[in-house]
């Protein structure tokens, strides 16, 4: 017996050593969901707030971000699309990643992405990212040109910054982030230079925030602060921004105490709307002549009333009936001698040198007359040409889908919070400038 034990003891020792190595390896792998590409963080400390820096594109007025994807991680520039259903990028050229996967048709991932069709690739004789057979087909669209096409549902690593007190924390990873490899023609028009596709934040199963909420167990809330200046960053925060223990928003009491809120309505397509019952210019009500109740009525899902919040229109678009009266009331409160020929796409422009008397106040009145969003001078006017300032609102014609489509110029330098748990949208009643702040200086975005 002793002899037999002596013979098998080396095998037991080897087995125990291998088991220890396997347990250690498994422990390390379990931590990889919250792994910083530069340094290791513990899996026991799940992030409560995530940060994505955002920049303005000077040529289009739209906003974009660098997301970190693939293995090894690399920066991928994408357009911010508040109402988009998912992230899509073009994978036809230069997509290199050791962790790319294309889920099989009718798989769990397909169901999660609401993909009910199979994808067959005809572009290439060999398989590559974005080109496999018997995978999931997902419809993607360019939010600027409205072109659309089927692509391949894919999954790969995505990394995003966490926070550590008032500073940026380590990057954390989602190992199987779902997105679409879309046809390359979708990215050829309308998008800022070098952008590879849009990053969707709409109310949809595989939009960015919903995958982050699910993966990290975050509070279902995200905040957006878009910078007016191409040389400085704004940011989107995912998670509980009101948790003062996070302390990430500098002087958060000053920034957040000024917030007012109104119900958040979501269309069947997952787009974000808020009710605007009235527009006031220097306290004068803007009342459409042909339909006085246009702003205060709600039309349901067939034609959503109110204001759609977007990040893919640089300027706010108004239904013609509203635009006509709004510009007339605004012009009545401006010096007539300052008005000049309009510069497209705007309908009302002025000689900047003759505007020393100030700009009329414009307020959007929400469900309650106490809930008012005051649009600052900088958010109202656009420097269309040298020496020419225009009212930054565009005539949308008679057949708009909704009365108001809020554009990025009016949203810049405001904190806008989408509280999906309480179905409400919150915003500063006055721009951050009234507090002496900007989107760039209320966040620490160093080394982002």
Curated annotation (Swiss-Prot):
Residue span, Peptidase A1 domain: 63-428
Cited InterPro entries: Aspartic_peptidase_A1 (IPR001461), PEPTIDASE_A1 (IPR033121), Peptidase_aspartic_dom_sf (IPR021109), TAXi_C (IPR032799), TAXi_N (IPR032861), Xylanase_inhibitor_I-like (IPR033868)
Signal peptide feature range: 1-33
GO molecular-function terms, A-Z: aspartic-type endopeptidase activity
Pfam families linked: TAXi_C, TAXi_N
Residues flagged as site, Cleavage: 296-297
Major location (coarse): secreted
Glycosylated residue positions: 133
Keyword Glycoprotein: yes
Cystine bridges: 91-181, 105-118, 110-136, 121-131, 349-390
Biotechnology: May be used in antidiabetic therapies and diets for type 2 diabetes (T2D).
GO cellular component, one term: extracellular region
Keywords on record: Allergen, Disulfide bond, Glycoprotein, Secreted, Signal
Factors inducing expression: Secreted in high amounts upon heat treatment of mature seeds.
Post-translational modification remark: Glycosylated on alpha chain.
Tissue spec: Expressed in developing seeds and in the young roots and cotyledons of germinating seeds and young seedlings.
Entry-linked PROSITE patterns: PEPTIDASE_A1 (PS51767)
Additional remarks: Capable of reducing glycaemia in mammals.
Role description: Sulfur-rich seed storage protein that remains undegraded at germination.
Family: Belongs to the peptidase A1 family.
Subunit: Two-subunit monomeric unit made of alpha and beta subunits coupled by disulfide bonds (at pH 4.5 and under non-reducing conditions). Can also form oligomers including dimer, tetramer and cyclic hexamer (trimer of dimers) (at pH > 5.5). Component of globulins complexes which accumulate in seeds. Interacts with flavonoids (e.g. apigenin glucosides) present in globulins complexes.
The protein, known as: Gamma conglutin 2
Gene source species: Lupinus albus
């Amino acid at each position: 017996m002793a002899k037999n034990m002596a013979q098998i003891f080396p095998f037991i020792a080897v087995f125990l050593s291998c088991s220890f190595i396997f347990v250690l390896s498994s422990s390390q792998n379990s931590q990889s969901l919250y792994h910083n590409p530069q340094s290791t963080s513990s899996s026991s400390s799940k992030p409560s707030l995530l940060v994505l820096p955002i920049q303005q594109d000077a040529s289009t007025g739209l906003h974009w971000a660098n997301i970190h994807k693939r293995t090894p991680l690399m920066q991928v520039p994408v357009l911010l699309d508040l109402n988009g259903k998912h992230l899509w990028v073009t994978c036809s050229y230069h997509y290199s990643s050791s962790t790319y996967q294309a889920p099989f048709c009718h798989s769990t991932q397909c169901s999660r992405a609401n993909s009910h069709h199979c994808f067959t690739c005809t572009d290439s004789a060999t398989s590559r990212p974005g080109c496999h057979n018997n995978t999931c087909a997902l419809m993607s669209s360019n939010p600027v040109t409205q072109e659309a096409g089927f692509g391949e549902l894919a999954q790969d690593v995505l990394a995003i910054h966490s926070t550590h007190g008032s500073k940026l924390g380590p990057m954390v990873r989602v190992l199987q982030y779902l997105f679409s490899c879309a046809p390359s023609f979708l990215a050829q028009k309308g998008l800022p230079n070098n952008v590879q596709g849009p990053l969707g934040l709409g109310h949809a199963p595989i939009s960015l925030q919903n995958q982050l909420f699910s993966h990290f167990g975050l509070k279902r809330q995200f905040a957006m602060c878009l910078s007016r200046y191409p040389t400085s960053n704004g940011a989107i925060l995912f998670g509980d921004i009101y948790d003062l223990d996070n302390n990430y928003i500098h002087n958060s009491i000053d920034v957040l105490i000024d917030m007012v809120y109104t119900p958040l309505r979501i269309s069947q397509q997952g787009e974000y709307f808020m009710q605007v019952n009235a527009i006031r210019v220097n306290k004068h009500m803007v009342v459409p002549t042909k339909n006085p109740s246009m702003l205060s009525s709600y039309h349901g899902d067939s034609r959503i009333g109110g204001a759609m919040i977007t990040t893919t229109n640089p300027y706010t678009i108004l239904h013609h009936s509203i635009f006509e009266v709004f510009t007339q009331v605004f012009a009545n409160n401006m010096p007539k001698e300052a008005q000049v020929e309009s510069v497209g796409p705007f309908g009302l422009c002025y000689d900047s040198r003759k505007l020393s008397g100030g700009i009329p106040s414009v307020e959007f009145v929400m469900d309650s007359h106490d809930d008012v969003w005051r649009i600052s001078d900088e958010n109202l006017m656009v420097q269309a040409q040298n020496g020419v300032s225009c009212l930054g609102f565009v005539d949308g014609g008679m057949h708009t889908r909704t009365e108001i489509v809020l554009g990025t110029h009016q949203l810049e330098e405001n904190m806008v919070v989408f509280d999906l748990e309480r179905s409400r949208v919150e915003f500063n009643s006055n721009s951050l400038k009234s507090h002496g702040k900007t989107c760039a200086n209320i966040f620490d975005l160093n080394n982002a």
